[in-house]
Amino acid sequence: METVQLRNPPRRQLKKLDEDSLTKQPEEVFDVLEKLGEGSYGSVYKAIHKETGQIVAIKQVPVESDLQEIIKEISIMQQCDSPHVVKYYGSYFKNTDLWIVMEYCGAGSVSDIIRLRNKTLTEDEIATVLQSTLKGLEYLHFMRKIHRDIKAGNILLNTEGHAKLADFGVAGQLTDTMAKRNTVIGTPFWMAPEVIQEIGYNCVADIWSLGITAIEMAEGKPPYADIHPMRAIFMIPTNPPPTFRKPELWSDNFTDFVKQCLVKSPEQRATATQLLQHPFVKSAKGVSILRDLINEAMDVKLKRQESQQREVDQDDEENSEEDEMDSGTMVRAVGDEMGTVRVASTMTDGANTMIEHDDTLPSQLGTMVINTEDEEEEGTMKRRDETMQPAKPSFLEYFEQKEKENQINSFGKSVPGPLKNSSDWKIPQDGDYEFLKSWTVEDLQKRLLALDPMMEQEIEEIRQKYQSKRQPILDAIEAKKRRQQNF
C-alpha cells in the first residue's frame, strides 16, 4: 500500500503545518519511510505527510545538542519564503528529540550527483544551477542573512531540477548594529579570505564560496583540495585568487564569472544581484537540461541498492546454511566471528541535510568530490559529541579529528631520528637554517611530515586560550539575561 501511496501525487500542497497537526504526536501526522543520512546536529529521515501524501524530510535532533544553534537554524528557515530556499513546515518535541520538518529534495545534492555519475557538470548545467543558487542568495542577502557554508553539498535539487539552498546550521543574521561578522565558520576550502583573517565580513563572503563551488562543479573538487587544509587556510588569504586548473577548457564567460566571484577585496566583489546579470548566468538554459543527469544519478543509485540487497540476501543464505551445518555437536561462538553479515544501509554517515547517499560512496566525504582514489576527503559534516561543547570553527574540528587519526596511526612507532632531540624543534634565531644542510633527505622529509601536527597543536592551544577568556564573558552575559528575564 505504501508504494501505491508514494506514486500518487500529493492531494494538496503542504505549505505549513497547522495548529491541529502540531498538537498531535509526529507519528500521527507522518509515516517515516527511511533514513537519508546525517546532517548538521542530527539525523535526517524521509517521511510522508499522511493528510496530503507529500514527501518531506525530517531532521531529528537530540535535545542534548547545541539548542541555540538549532533554534537559530529553525529561525532562519522559518523567516524564509523562497522557491530557491528549502522550506520549513514546523517542529515537534518527541521524547528527547526535536523533529524539524522540511522540504524534501529527491535528487539530493549537486555533489551527490557528481559522485554517483562519476562525472562533473557541463557549463550549461553549471549555469542553470548557479542561476537558481544566485536567486536564493539574493533573497537571503536581501533579508540580511549570510549562509556561510555555500558548496555543492548544500545545493539540493528536486526531481524537476530546481536548485535550493539547504543546511542553515552555520548561517548568520546581520543586524543594523552589526555590519560585519567576525566568526570563523564554514568549510576550509570554500572560505573567503576575510572570513579566515577574521577582519569582519558580510554577505559577499557567500559569493566567494559560490565561485569556489563553480570550480568544484566543473573540476570535481575545490582549489587546494590536494593539499593539507591547514596549509590552505594560510594560502587562501595570501595567494592570488584561484583559477581553473586548465583554463583553456572553459569559455570566456564562465572564466569571467568565476573571476568576478573570487575578488579578494570584499568591497570590490560582485553581489548576487549583479551576478544574476552576468552573461554566463543570463544565458542559462531551463531546468529541463538537468533532468537527464538527475535521472542518470538516480538510476545508478537504484542499481547499487539492488546490488547491495542481492549481496545481503546471498549472505543471509550462506549464514542460514552455516547454521544448519552447525546444528550438530559443534556450538557456534557468538562474538567477533559474526562479522560476515552486512547491514542493509544505503546511506553514509557523512551525508548532508536531506541528501541521499549510497554506501559504496566514500564515507564522511561531506561535499568535496575527489576524482583520484588516494586523496584525502573532507567536509563540514562531522559527528558531534552528545554533551555540550564550546563553539569552534568547523575547520578546527577537522584538524582535531585528523590529529587523532595521526596519533592512532603513529602509535607504537619510533620518533624520527633528528626529531628526538628537543632542541631540533626550536625555531632558529634570525632565520638561520644552516643546520639543515647537514641532514639527510630522509631526515628532512620526516621533519616536514612532523610540522603539520605541531602546527595543529599550537592552533589548538591558541583556541583553548581564547576560549578560556571568552567563556567568562559569555557566562556573564547569560547571567545578566537571566536576571533581566526574572524582572
Curated annotation (Swiss-Prot):
ATP binds at L36, G37, E38, G39, S40, Y41, G42, S43, V44, K59. Residues 303-312 have a biased composition (Basic and acidic residues). Residues 303-332 are annotated as: Disordered. InterPro entries: Kinase-like_dom_sf (IPR011009), Mst1_2_SARAH_domain (IPR024205), p53_tetramer_sf (IPR036674), Prot_kinase_dom (IPR000719), Protein_kinase_ATP_BS (IPR017441), SARAH_dom (IPR011524), STE20/SPS1-PAK (IPR050629). GO terms for cellular component: cytoplasm; nucleus. Homodimer; mediated via the coiled-coil region. Interacts with NORE1, which inhibits autoactivation. Interacts with and stabilizes SAV1. Interacts with RASSF1. Interacts with FOXO3. Interacts with RASSF2 (via SARAH domain). Interacts with AR, PKB/AKT1, TNNI3 and SIRT1. Interacts with DLG5 (via PDZ domain 3). Interacts with MARK3 and SCRIB in the presence of DLG5. This is Serine/threonine-protein kinase 4.
